[in-house]
Amino acid sequence: VDECSRGRARRWLIVAVCQVVVFLGTVTTAMLVIAVPQIISTMGLGEDGQQWMVAGYALAYALMLVPGGRLGDVWRRRAVFVSSLVLSGVAATSAALARTPVWLVLSVLVQGGALGVVSPQILGFFQQLFNKKERGRPYGLLGVAFAVALGSGPVLGGVLVDVSPENGWRLIFVANASIAFLAATLGFLLIPALTTPPDRFWWRRTDPVGVILFVVGMVALWIPMVEETARTPVLWVLAPVGALVLVGFVFWERRQANRGSPLVDLGLLRVRSYGLGALIAVLFGAYDALYYVLALYLQDGVGHSPLTTGLVMAPIAGGTAAGAVVGGRLAWRAGRRVVALGLLTSLVGLAAVMVGDLFLPTFDSPHSAALPLLFAGLGAGFVLSGLGSGLTNIPNQTVTMSQVPNTRAGSAAGMLHTGHRLGISAGIVGVSTALFATLDRTGGNWLAAFRTTLLIIAAFILVALLIALMDIVTRKEGQVR
């Protein structure tokens, strides 16, 4: 009995370690967006460099999710978990010591990729440690860690940046490195070796050709979008090259499917609920660009401090946490209808932000707004948009996975999360490009630029809402609506 009790206690210690990792992955992004204006001023980071750092982090994270999950399946999961956390800590330390923009960006990209490898290991641990009926609670605890990181990240980032006007952003990476090394140590000490030793040819089952084709194709498509502001036409040659590589990736994965070892199961896209849900996840990824443009607008446009900016952004996390709790409970009963409600609520929230923004100071008087006015003018809209985000993401994942066989659940979840992360990266690139273009066109009118970005984000969410409504109307009787 004592041995059994110790085993159960260790499971929850492992969950606690996983909470630390989820907190790390979320708080890194939340703090980083707050620090962008200071990094721009101290490191001379241009528009392209900003996109490489913020959107590049999301892209690197996304590209490593599926390969990371496969690596954990065929090799030693604990070893993958711990070594990737160590790499993340080393990359964060390197970023804190960076002396050039290229050094900083490369460090951030490595950090994002390393955390992308770590993330699917958590799902693997839970699959092995808990049965289906038990998994709800540990996943709920991960949701708590996510909400805490989302709410505290902007505030913590603001505090650290305010500590030192020149190098406060470096403290953010020091904090990230400390958390990563702590999680790696706890993981090594607490997590048992849950997988059997791999055979000599384990690497073949990671589909290395598929990984290379996928990464090269996505990066080739992504570079011209990021470097567009450099007006370098030759870079656009990479776009068709990337498209051709991705076509080759599709053919390769179909061939691998016949052999039984594809990197991604493209046949899942023919499952109606999965295909539509994955598309909604990609489109709604644009919502996360709100954090980036909001941090730039409130600091560079309106003239507030990083700490004030973090406090103003905090209500988004409260709404997201509440929406996640409610959405998780309603997902099985109301299905895609909850997703549609969440998307609609996000749109209403963005509209409320635009209305509240009308009462903020214009570009001609950037320093006259008080913190209470910011909370009153933007807070309600942020709470609503965050509530909509929580009502969208978890229910959409539940409904999207509802018709996927258990034998394909791992691949399906990896593809879904990858699509959402790619949507985040593309959204940041597209929205930030529109932001800078509007600033150039209007002579630096931040108010017009911010409203333009809100309209673009709203357009993506509107398309996702139309897809959700189409699914509700045309879904057959007996399926989860």
Show where each model-derived region lies.
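Extracellular/periplasmic helix-loop-helix junction of adjacent transmembrane segments
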Residues: 33-64, 103, 307, 311
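12-transmembrane solute porter fold
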Residues: 11-27, 32-34, 235, 260-441, ...
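Membrane-interface helix termini in secondary transporters
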Residues: 38, 69-70, 74, 159, ...
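Helix-loop-helix hairpins in multi-pass membrane proteins, especially solute transporters
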Residues: 73-209
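Hydrophobic transmembrane-helix bundles of small-molecule transporters
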Residues: 162-279
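Central cavity-lining transmembrane alpha-helices of secondary-active solute carriers
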Residues: 55-69, 115, 119-123, 314-326
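Loop-to-transmembrane helix entry/capping segments in MFS-fold secondary transporters
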Residues: 47-48, 132-142, 306-307, 406-415
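Glycine/proline-centered helix-kink
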Residues: 120, 141, 146-158, 218, ...
